[in-house]
Structures are given as structure tokens and as C-alpha cells.
Amino acid sequence: LKEMIQSWRHVFKLDPDKEIDDETLDAVCLSGTDAIMVGGSTGVTYENTVNLLSRVRRYELPCVQEVSDLEAVVPGFDLYMVPMVLNTQDPTWIMGRHREGIERYGYMIPWDLVVTEGYIVLNENAAVAKLTGAETSIEASAAAAYAQIADKLMNLPIVYLEYSGVYGDMETVRTVRRSLDNARLFYGGGITSAQQASEAAAIADTIVVGNVVYDHLEQALETVKAVKD
């Protein structure tokens, strides 16, 4: 199952804390995207995650949970993606929460379904940056160094560049991509058009499209075509 991420080019990220009607969800799940990622920085609960999972499960496509809160981990996802924030001085988000989770729930964890993401958060105004105390104003060379720590020292399968809500600096994305040998580069942040999707996907291995689903559905659907064509 972990191998399936290697073929993903486009992923829609849905937030359990946001309303999405059946018609919109239908369009998203039948769009041709490679997977649905369920997760958010705030307001994620067990109940709203179960609700969203049960609705996505009607469709034939992989559904993964990005784990942000231990209390909201729900059985039944194809994979569990666990972020490890690399560019923070607060060890809580590198290892602290992870230790707590394993100590409490270790016996229940389906390790064969767990994938760790080396997160590099680069938008200072994003909720995830404020929550984790991420050092967002780093140079591209520093971001690339963090990426190499994830790739070469920690052997993480995914490096995730998170611009969360703003379209990122593609030169930084390119610098990070060049620094990687084995890890897959996920890019997320501010993709609202086919052109941006195409540009980001030409550099990153996988693009993650989120907020635009709730704001401009047609534009969101066009991002799939832009990547797939």
C-alpha cells in the first residue's frame, strides 16, 4: 500500500472541519485525482473525520488521513500520513507528539499503513506555522538542507513543502526538488488555477490541492486536467 504514493501526481485535500455538499464531493472524487487526503490544522475531530471518510468511501479511490490530532485518528483509511515538522525548534512537532501517540496507542497502530512526511512549512501566516513555531523565513538552501535530512539521514518517503494558502516560490521548490534522491516531493499551497497546477507539477512529484475546492470548484477540477494532460 505504501508503494501507491509513488504514482500520485495530484491529490485533493479535504478538511473535515469544512462543509462540503454531496454534489461537490461527487465532482471531486470522480475528477480523476489520484487520492483524497483528509486532514486539517485545526478543528479536526474523530466525529467529523468519520463522517467525511464514510462519504469518500463510496468512491473507488485511495483515501488517506493526515494525522494532526491523536484523538481524531480513525480506523479504515488506506494510509496514515504522519507529519514531522523539520523547520521548527520545538521538538513537540518533530518527536514529542509522536512519542505521546506511540506510548498511548502503539499497540493499535497499523505500522504497515503509516507513512512519515518530512514537513517544511514556509508560510508564516498559516495556522500550521503558528501552531508549530515553524521558522518560515529560511532561504531555499536551508529548505533544501532540511529536505536532505529527511531524504538521506532519516530515509523518509515524503518531503512535503507546505505553503498552506499562498502560492509558493517555485525557485525554492525547484531547489528542494534537486536536492532529493529518493523521497517524493509533495507541494501544497495556494494552487487555484490550471496554470499554477501545471507549473507546480512540472517541478514537484505530487501536488496537493485544497482550499480552492471550497471556493471555486470548477477551477479546482481544472487542476486535475492540467496535471494529467
Task: State the predicted function of each range.
Residues Q65, D69-V82, V176-V209:
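Catalytic cores of alpha/beta
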Residues L1-L61, E135-I158:
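Conserved N-terminal beta1-alpha1 strand-loop-helix module at the mouth
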Residues V38-G43, L79-I94, Y163, G189-I191, ...:
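Glycine-rich phosphate-binding active-site loops on the catalytic face of alpha/beta enzymes
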Residues T42-V56, V64-F77, G168-S179:
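N-terminal active-site wall of soluble small-molecule enzyme domains
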Residues W8-L14, I36-V38, C63-Q65, Y80-V82, ...:
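Hydrophobic faces of well-ordered beta-strands that scaffold small-molecule active sites
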Residues V50-V56, M95-H98, Y105, V212-D229:
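C-terminal helical cap(s) of enzyme catalytic domains, especially alpha/beta-barrels
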Residues A72-P157:
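Conserved anion-binding
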Residues K13, D17, D112-V114, Y119, ...:
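Alpha/beta catalytic cores of nucleotide-metabolism and tRNA/nucleoside-modifying enzymes
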